[in-house]
Amino acid sequence: MFQNSVKNGVYPAPLQSLWAMVAIITSLHFAGFKMPYSLTDKILTLLPGKTLEWQFTACTIMAIVIWLTVIYTLRYTLKLLLMYKGWMYEQRGKNRQVSLKTKLWLLAVKILSSGGNKPLLYSYQGSLPRLPLPPVEETMKRYLRSVRPLYDDEQYTKVEKLAEEFRNGIATKLQRYLVLKSWWSSNYVSDWWEEYVYLRGRSPLIVNSNFYGIDAILMSPTQSQAARAAMIIHTCLQYRRLIERQELEPILIQGLVPLCSWQYERVFNTTRVPGVETDKIVHYNDTKHIVVYHKGRYFKVYIYHQNRILHPCEIEIQMQMILEDTSAPAPERTAWANARTEFFFKGTNRQSLDAVEKAAFVVALDDIPYEFDENDPSKLDQYGNILLCGKGYDRWFDKSFTLCFSTNGRIGFNAEHSW
């Protein structure tokens, strides 16, 4: 929302501080106090007149300039403070001894972070420091240290020689490129990692990239597939609303050091669209339906009524209707991209594909139970295999995640890795 974007843009200062600044500058002007360099008077000379209205306009402009200057000063000060890593190596525990440097740092961060308003989910994004670029020598040392257990002495000597050739050769040129990229990018590696490690991969997602999550295996809240599906779907929609309204609190280490919240943005309403050479991730801003798969058929299920999320009981009715009512992409990426272009370009196929790709997420109502037995580990292996692969055609592997529900009320999910 626009209001949240403005609040994030001025954090750590509260938005109300603008009106306080306007009141202070206006009061000083009409009280006869001269601003430094007579800036208010200089602004007034650029305006059409010197009436009370134009004087107030000049004061407002001056207040906005000072307010923005203070905000950016606070933000970049906080960014510099968050670059300090010494707190990681301090002692932990009740009788810990914390250095004076870290104590002063903690106090400064706390003062700047508590700016009078509660931070939204993305409030700290503009204050996070850039990912530091390590020198080539340090990178090579860490690489050699990481591979040493994998090689015998003869093989490791060859690797050392190759590393030395790389360090004395093209490494310097590549490092310069990374330095340039780090100047205009907050993270010099994330976009390349996403594209070249994930999106350019041509192997099927089913076992090469996607991962799965499993239910709390020692708990069984209900044996009803429709009821469990309805409750989890409703909970996911509430969680999505928290993200969209930025009401979810950012993660703070020790309640003070913020972590990046950017990845929350693509949890829902996101799909991976195949391409011949590289895929792309598409995120939709507003989606009011989900897609449910059951026994070879896909159902478009609306999850809102008059801008209200459906109650669990209302969703359960729809799930039960689907269960009582008497093909997904898993091929190689280039083949799927060509099929998508050829067969899903227009008409009903295009509309059906849009319904799936623009869904908040996908739900699979499986027609088998997910079983767990402490005395039979193979059942847990089968449970995980079902969530990871299904039958090969009953998961939409390109969606950000697919919720899977069994006939005995257990759940799990299959998630696409690149987002």
What are these regions (language model features)?
Residues 1-399, 407-409, 416-418:
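Long, Pro/Ser/Thr-rich low-complexity/intrinsically disordered regulatory tracts in eukaryotic proteins
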